[in-house]
């Protein structure tokens, strides 16, 4: 954990998807504090050894982890197995809409089946 910028909580319902977004400068620190989610990361950074690769991580109260996501990694999540799940995100910078990029879940650059 590098530093504290802000924390927010995101609610997601079962089988719903919140994707895709990235932060150009901030590191994200996700933890699932209630329910269960599938967190998906996608790297399309030029020169990265993991370029065009996905990583799937199941977060829940039973599989409790803090996942740190560096800048410029696309991410999104899907609610699993619970009516409602809550994700905590502790960012390293205060909220700044101009350092975020958003895409639709079915955007063609991802080619990902939720």
Residue ranges and their predicted role:
Residues 1-66, 80-114:
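Non-catalytic, conserved peripheral segments adjacent to functional cores
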